[in-house]
């Protein structure tokens, strides 16, 4: 019997489960070998607004994050199917804790995922850049980057 390809909804559900799994690198298995990730609210140069990357680079990035934080559970999750059968929109909350202090945190996301053959080929990730920078320990860098932007605008 031939293997069936996961639907976009099933792929999104697998991604969310992997986010709180024992090995966050497993999230990378939800992505195609080459993928485009866009983060429209990202603040360059801290985080690029668009990245063309590979599944293995994502795996390394996801695993590296466990040095400072672990995602423990999901809050509210809503998966929206769209008129395009290859696109789903997921809204979710990731709850976790910092590895050194066990202090809790929560991050909310909205992602527009384009999925082909059961793998994410394109992602548009919308999240709060301030909360994200705080969780990854880069809030001072974000403030500096924003200050430079404001200075350039006011010049």
For every predicted segment, state its role.
Residues 1-29, 33, 141-155:
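Short, low-complexity N-terminal intrinsically disordered segments enriched in polar/charged residues
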Residues 2, 18, 49-50, 123:
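Short N-terminal micro-motifs specific to bacterial/archaeal maturation
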Residues 2-4, 67-155:
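A beta-strand edge to alpha-helix "cap/lid" segment located at domain peripheries
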Residues 5, 25, 32-85:
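A solvent-exposed, acidic/Ser-Thr-rich amphipathic alpha-helical stretch
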Residues 12, 16-19, 31, 39, ...:
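Hydrophobic alpha-helical core bundles mediating ligand binding, dimerization, or RNAP-core interactions
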Residues 15, 27-28, 35, 54, ...:
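Hydrophobic pocket/interface hotspot
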